[in-house]
Design a protein with these regions (language model features):
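Conserved alpha/beta-hydrolase
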Residues: 401-416
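Alpha/beta-hydrolase fold active-site loops
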Residues: 359, 373, 452
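Structural cue for short, hydrophobic secondary-structure segments
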Residues: 377-380, 396, 406
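Alpha/beta-hydrolase fold nucleophile elbow
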Residues: 447-457
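Peripheral, non-catalytic segments that deliver or gate enzyme domains
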Residues: 2-370, 382-400, 425-427, 432, ...
């Protein structure tokens, strides 16, 4: 990259890197995906030897990877055409031929992958519906469940893939499914991965449940589940051995997710989202105490606990590109290439929508005084959230002299169940009211020029 390119283009071209995962039995062996080559490809690295390499080289790009438990093979989901339909492939960690990982599984859309000693589980959807396959002791995979409604391996939807599917000893498999409701309000089902028999189920009518992470202790049948019985997402521990359900006592505003356990199963790694900014905590299960983990404000894209108790996380900020860090603040993996030019900071912002609601969002401005021409940049979903997170497109508009307003309108996540579900049966009304109210507020603040306003997203 050359300094002669404008800052906005350099931001788009700066390589990005995911948070590395590691092999459970060989934690020095890492897997991650990066855009060093121009599109996302899977990479591996060995912390013990310093060796590393790019594993995939596919024109469509490869965004999902994992390591086998022993670290001898790297697994990746390859989509040949960009349709997102593909297969899991395996390649030796040190290099060699890539071959389909699970025999007996046809091409489809990725529904998650989980591994435990002696068992592998994979979710696949195709034109015929949604299915779950398991391979026992390396044998060809068998279909153990199929349905017409969404079924995914636990952890996929929670962002904790590899931790929320199979219990540590492989005796239980958690699935998130919509057989009783819909995509927005899934239930959690636990089955025997060898027979497909139902062990237990949790269903909250009109509310969402998602499996997050199993205890790492073999034989421990405690599963962290995310629920929204109090309005905001909250973690609970479901003990499949006893049936006991324990809600975590957390005096925090906004969604809270438990994303991993410490290796001795004494504490949970918790991510708290407070109005579009995340904070990591350690939650001690015995005393029920919460301790903040120090880091800069921003958005935590992923976080996990290393076998030695260190915490790794991926942090993004509106004005700084994402970095993969340890609790000490050191980078755990860094892509080759120049760092992205710093952008302008996101400003947290509230306004009244004229219908009795207080709406939250962020805005960004160029240097100097307004009013500026403005882009009201609307997130998709609608079940999504604008957070204090790096976005080269937003910074490009700011470089061109525009202010950018981002509104977490009714229908967005991050502000409770009722706020998210407000658009059900009423698409095209409340969200437009909120975005327009946000524009009016920015005009009133002197940030935006009402005669030079556009909408995008």
């Amino acid at each position: 990259m050359t300094d002669t390119l404008p800052a906005w283009e350099r931001r788009f071209r700066t390589p990005s890197v995911s948070l590395p995962g590691w092999a459970r039995q060989a934690p020095d062996r890492l897997v991650y995906w990066s855009t060093e080559s121009g599109v996302y490809q899977v990479h591996v690295a060995d912390r013990a030897t310093g060796a590393g390499r790019q594993v995939t080289d596919h024109p469509v790009g490869v965004l999902s990877g994992a390591l086998t438990l022993d670290g001898e093979h790297v697994l990746f989901w390859q989509d040949e055409t960009g349709s997102e339909a593909g297969l899991w492939h395996a390649q030796p960690f040190d290099g060699g031929e890539a071959t389909p990982y699970l025999q007996g599984v046809s091409q489809g859309w990725n529904g998650g992958l989980a591994q435990a000693p002696g068992v592998v589980a994979a979710g696949i959807s195709d034109a015929g519906g949604f299915a779950v396959y398991t391979s026992i002791d390396g044998e060809p995979a068998s279909e153990i469940r199929r349905g017409s409604e969404s079924i995914t391996v636990g952890g996929l939807r929670s962002g904790t893939s590899g931790r929320g599917g199979l219990s540590a000893d492989g005796s239980l498999l958690a699935l998130d499914h919509a057989e009783h409701s819909d995509e927005m309000h899934p239930a959690v089902l636990v089955i025997d991965p060898r027979t497909g028999a139902t062990i237990a189920e949790q269903v909250d009518e009109g509310m969402a449940l998602l499996s997050s992470c199993w205890s790492p202790a073999p034989g421990d049948q405690r599963l962290v589940v995310s629920h929204e019985r109090e309005g905001d997402e909250r973690p609970a521990i479901w003990d499949l051995a006893t049936g006991e359900w324990i809600d975590l006592d957390l005096d925090l505003r906004g969604p809270v997710h438990a994303v991993d356990w410490w290796p001795d199963a004494s504490a949970l790694l918790v991510v708290h989202n407070d109005e579009g900014r995340d904070r990591l905590h350690r939650y001690e299960l015995g005393p029920g105490s919460l301790t903040a983990i120090e880091h800069e404000q921003g958005t935590i894209g992923a976080a996990s606990v290393r076998p030695d108790g260190d915490v790794w996380y991926r942090l993004s900020r509106g004005d700084h590109a994402p970095v993969a860090l340890s609790a000490s603040g050191a980078e755990v993996v860094r892509p080759r290439g120049e760092a992205a030019p710093v952008g302008r900071p996101f400003v947290s912002w509230h306004f009244d929508n004229g219908e009795g609601d207080r709406v939250h969002g962020f805005y960004v401005t160029p240097e100097g005084d307004g009013p500026f021409p403005v882009v009201m940049f609307v997130h998709g979903g609608p079940t999504g959230q604008d957070t204090d997170e790096w976005d080269p497109e937003v910074q490009a508009y700011v470089d061109m002299g525009f202010a950018v307003g981002m509104v977490n309108y009714r229908g967005s996540t991050g502000y409770g169940r009722a706020w998210r579900d407000r658009l059900i049966g009423d698409i095209g009304g409340p969200e437009l009211v909120d975005v327009n109210a946000g524009l009016s507020d920015l005009v009133a603040k002197g940030v935006a020029d009402s005669d030079r306003a556009v909408i995008g997203g």
